[in-house]
Amino acid sequence: MFYSDYLKLLKIFVVGVFPCTLFVNAPHGKLAKQSKLFSKGYISGRVGWVLMELVAPLTFLYAIRNNRHFESTLPSLGDGSNRDYLDSCRKVLAGMFLVHYANRALVSPLLMAPQVSPMHWTVFVSAVLFNFLNGMSIGLYLVQASVQHHPVSIIRRYIGMFLWLMGWLGNMYHDNILYDLRRSSNKKKDPDNLDTVQSENSYYRIPYGGLFQYVSCPNYFCEWIEWFGCYLAAGPSAEPFWWFFLSEILLMLPRALKAHQWYCKKFPKYPANRRAIIPFLM
C-alpha cells in the first residue's frame, strides 16, 4: 500500500469521529465515567496511554525501515549534493515526529504524570487506529512521495522548525504545570476546599502560569502550533502533515471546549476572562 491509501483511511476515520466528539465526552481523564453510556469497560489509564501512543512511532519506523520504494525515489532527486540535502530534510521531519512521541508515549506517562485516570476501551481502540493510520501515512510519505519534489524555501523551513520547537516546549511546559498541580492537590486532598475538586481518583485545582492566564487548555494550543510548524517545514505538498495538523484541531477542539465547561462548572472562582483554547478568541 502507498501513503495515499492510509491517508484516505485516516480522512474517513477523522471525518467519521469528529461529529461524535461534538456530542459525547470522550471517557478518559477528568471526564471519565461521567456518562451512563460509558459506565463500564475501563482500563488502566497509564498502561493504555503508553500502549496507544507507542503505536504511532513504531508504525512510523516500520514504514520507513521496510518500505521497498525508498531507494527508487532517490535517483529522481538529482545529484549527490542535492540528495544529501533532501535526506537531511527527511531526517529533520522524522526527528520532529519521533521526539514528540518519545515524550508523549514514554516520558509523560511513565516519568512525569503522578496519576492517570482510567480510560474507556473505546478511547484506547480509537487512539490506536488513529496513530496507526497517521504513523503509516506520514512514514510512507517521507520515503515514497518525497516532500523534496516540491522544494521548500529555507525561510519557510526554518520558520516551521522554530514553531515546532516552541509548540513542543510549550506543550511540555503546560503539561508539567498540570502535573505539579495534581501532585500538590493529591497531597492536600481536601474535597471541602472550593479550590479543589475530586474527579475519579485524582484531585484538581485551577491551573495558573504561562498561557493558562488566557486559556484552559494551552497544552492543546501549543500542540497545534507544534504540528502546524511541522507542516510548514514539510512544505505545501505534504498532505499527510497537513491532515495530522487538521486532525489535531478537529479531535481536540471539542475536548478543549468540554474541559473548559468542566472547569467553569466545578470551580465557582474560575477566571471569567479565560477562553477554552485560543487566547482572546475561543
UniProtKB/Swiss-Prot annotation:
Q: Which domain of life is it from?
A: Eukaryota
What InterPro entries does UniProt report for this protein, alphabetically?
3-oxo-5-alpha-steroid_4-DH, 3-oxo-5_a-steroid_4-DH_C, SRD5A/TECR
Q: Which Pfam families match?
A: Steroid_dh
Gene Ontology terms, MF aspect: 3-oxo-5-alpha-steroid 4-dehydrogenase activity; oxidoreductase activity
**What PANTHER family is this protein classified in?**
3-OXO-5-ALPHA-STEROID 4-DEHYDROGENASE (PTHR10556), STEROID 5-ALPHA-REDUCTASE DET2 (PTHR10556:SF43)
* Family from the record: Belongs to the steroid 5-alpha reductase family.
Q: What protein does this entry describe? A: Uncharacterized protein C9.08c
Provide the species name.
Schizosaccharomyces pombe (strain 972 / ATCC 24843) (Fission yeast)
